[in-house]
Amino acid sequence: MMRIALFLLTNLAVMVVFGLVLSLTGIQSSSVQGLLIMALLFGFGGSFISLLMSKWMALKSVGGEVIEQPRNDMEHWLMNTVAQQSRQAGIKMPQVAIYHAPDINAFATGARRDASLVAVSTGLLQNMSRDEAEAVIAHEISHIANGDMVTMTLIQGVVNTFVIFISRILAQIAAGFMGGNRDEGEGNNGNPLIYFAVAMVLELVFGILASIITMWFSRHREFHADAGSAKLVGREKMIAALQRLKTSYEPQEATSMMAFCINGKSKSLSEMFMTHPPLDKRIEALRSGQYIK
């Protein structure tokens, strides 16, 4: 309910901003309405399609195999652990998958809390103790229980819409001035070449700025998932798991998957563009109890 309220309030704020832009620039509302519809369709369409296909795409990207029937003691333990933690978190048991990778990693995805997927790497199963692995699984279960995948989709849809809409509004203004076309009868976009070039550049720039917002939220939700894991299995187990990650291989999963994994890539120009907070910050947050309620 809180996610939907946040979504509606955000979009109300977006509409207020759009109204101010129209009032200040005097752009014809008819063209803006069409542009807004297009921005909403493209902005949210791509995000929701990705969400609906997330389980399939995730499994394909890592070559994961869903466990239909446990074949050995490790798979039995994994299924039992996920089932137990799901009951504790109050969600339906997700599908469980294993994928072959040397790095210690796991991820959760899915369009709904009760139709989700948890996948773990063979590197995690081979290199972590049972206590550490339990903590990682609890971290992913917490992502599902918190509804992080849906919330990320809503946020991504809003920022996508902003990027598309604002970049084209500004491109329309720039094309009108730079093209010297002030005659409304010749079209609202001015010189089409200038309009296209400016729109592409602005989309690139605004897209980079928008990624800072989505990455901030991604880092923020990692702290809460760590706290959720601590509540499910104990703080010390989660701290031990994060300390183990500090000695693991650099993750090999595709960049598009990093926001869903417990272990993000550490090589980044700035923490602002990282999907995960530095491991030391996550450990310190657990020790201080900052996100544990």
Curated annotation (Swiss-Prot):
Subcellular location: Cell inner membrane
Keywords assigned: Cell inner membrane, Cell membrane, Hydrolase, Membrane, Metal-binding, Metalloprotease, Protease, Transmembrane, Transmembrane helix, Zinc
Binding-site list for Zn(2+): H139, H143, E222
Main location: membrane
Gene of this entry: htpX
Keyword Iron in annotation: no
High-level lineage: Bacteria, Pseudomonadati, Pseudomonadota, Gammaproteobacteria, Enterobacterales
Single GO cellular component term: plasma membrane
E.C. code: 3.4.24.-
GO biological process: proteolysis
Co-factor remark: Binds 1 zinc ion per subunit.
Catalytic residues, chain numbering: E140
Name of this protein: Protease HtpX
Membrane-traversing stretches: 4-24, 34-54, 158-178, 193-213
Family: Belongs to the peptidase M48B family.
GO terms for MF: metalloendopeptidase activity; zinc ion binding
Needed co-factor(s): Zn(2+)
Keyword Protease: yes
Pfam families: Peptidase_M48
Membrane-topology annotation of the record: Multi-pass membrane protein
Protein origin, superkingdom: Bacteria
